[in-house]
């Protein structure tokens, strides 16, 4: 999927993301790397999610076709106070007077709701890279360690990091070395 400008009209805002992909459930994943503090950052990621939702449903489609969106923000600045490096946000419906959480029913015969809120509403992940200060054990932690340090461990088991290491080695070669490497690969294939 594209990841740059998706401006529909001249007066429309565009939504620049670093990676936009679909998973095996046809849900949309938006990944954005943010190096510097930005005014109205939360509003911008909300706009990006709304834009992605509307881009992936046409006028003739039923609202049931609305795609689930995951917004992942990799932050290299301090967005606020908190002890964790990974935060998750999702819509919940809470009683104003009672404080109880509304349990949506989808099983009844004439239910007006076919999906649970967790299956419909966007989810937001804020990864505060600079707050990661532990030994990476899980694949996610290995990725965050790489994002913080720029180094990939030789014993990594995280999906994609081994491939990323190979790409980094390739792109760190001089143009002459890359050409020789490409010629070598062509010769043996």
Segments and roles (model prediction):
Residues 1-189:
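Elongated, amphipathic alpha-helical interaction scaffolds
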């Amino acid at each position: 999927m594209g990841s740059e400008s998706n401006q529909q009209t001249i007066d429309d805002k565009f939504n620049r993301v670093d990676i936009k992909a679909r998973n095996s459930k046809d849900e949309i994943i938006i990944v954005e790397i943010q190096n510097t503090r930005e005014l109205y950052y939360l509003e911008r990621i909300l706009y990006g999610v709304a834009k992605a939702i509307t881009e992936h449903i046409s006028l003739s489609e039923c609202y049931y076709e609305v795609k689930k969106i995951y917004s992942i923000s990799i932050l290299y600045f301090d967005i606020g106070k908190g002890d964790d490096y990974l935060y998750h946000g999702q819509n919940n419906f809470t009683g104003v007077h009672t404080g109880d959480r509304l349990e949506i029913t989808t099983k009844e015969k004439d239910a007006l709701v076919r999906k649970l809120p967790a299956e419909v509403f966007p989810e937001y992940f804020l990864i505060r890279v600079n707050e990661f200060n532990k030994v990476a054990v899980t694949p996610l932690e290995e990725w965050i360690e790489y994002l913080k340090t720029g180094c990939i461990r030789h014993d990594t088991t995280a999906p994609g990091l081994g491939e990323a290491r190979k790409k980094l080695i390739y792109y760190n070669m001089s143009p002459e070395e890359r050409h020789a490497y490409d010629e070598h690969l062509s010769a043996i294939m």
